[in-house]
């Protein structure tokens, strides 16, 4: 079953399209990483799926319903980001009680255990928390809601490294015990790739690819060797990224269609694997080049 279905989804903001004819499907009970540069359209997509915003054109379905102003979607979807706001009249304990009333699958015991583990006090006020503590409390809401579609938009903003690790471990343990569809938008792909089953990479509001983690890890390889040999050997291959290393050596990343590894070794070319996070950066680099080109 597909929890999310988008066809030719377009969202215009001002004079620009934040999303451009985006077509995707996301299956139930999966953890998907939503990856892209700032301004790629990640937050726009998540807010449309959550029913916060209405699409300009195209079709979007969540649980086979149009999410905008859908009570069913509102009760079964949660969108967590660092801009979540709560009434200044409510204490943290009050917020948890209200969440218990609203979300049908709310796990009060899990919320209480996480609340104690991260050293919150019942009478604290959300707006008075530090940025990292706000993100941590928001994470508790996201996990304890047990919504069938749970979306985290840069959920670890402001968190210490140790808290981020605790969050990812808590998310994975709770997902394994209570499977649901989870989408995580993050700039820290290297931190979450072990959690993910799929990666959706978007660039300029369009889908670049939607692959399983296994497919992504096999997508490309790195080649290092003498510049002349690398240029000749990659002439008919799709080069994703290339840079000069020293005077006569080049490193490049090529799509892994058919790579004769033995021939490469005979030519003195070193073949290496590519980290998923690095590959996504290479794929979405601006056409005008990298930062090194500024100093030429």
Predicted regions and their residues:
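Catalytic Walker B motif of ABC-type/P-loop ATPase nucleotide-binding domains
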Residues: 150-154
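Conserved ABC transporter NBD signature motif
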Residues: 58-72
